[in-house]
Regions:
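Long, terminal "pre-/pro-" and other extracytoplasmic accessory regions
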Residues: 1-105
């Protein structure tokens, strides 16, 4: 009969790794997505860890050489565990917001 009381040794259990273990990795992921979708006018600036959802919150700003961080355009959320985007605007939404911010500058 099998002994059901035995627990596996902790040494044999793999330690899961986080896809985005720190703020810098979240910034790089959002930056790469922004460059691919929009270009280099948008900058992933402020980054916060949201404990309740175990996610990174990254603020995206319109930024130029003459006027850095002109306008906040979006908030992006990424799962720290998987690296998946949990919430982000579409390319069209970002383009519209960027056009509006450019006109106001």
């Amino acid at each position: 009969m099998e002994n059901m009381d035995q627990q596996p040794h902790s040494e044999s259990l793999p330690i899961p790794r986080l896809a985005l273990p720190d703020a810098e990795s979240a910034r790089r992921t959002v930056g790469r997505w922004l460059r691919t979708e929009i270009g280099d006018a948008l900058y992933p600036a402020e980054i916060f860890f949201v404990q309740e959802s175990f996610a990174w919150h990254v603020s995206v700003w319109f930024s130029t050489a003459a006027r850095p961080m002109v306008a906040r355009l979006a908030d992006v959320y990424l799962s720290a565990a998987t690296g998946a985007f949990l919430g982000r605007p579409s390319r069209d939404e970002l383009t519209q917001r960027l056009d509006q911010a450019s006109k106001q500058e």
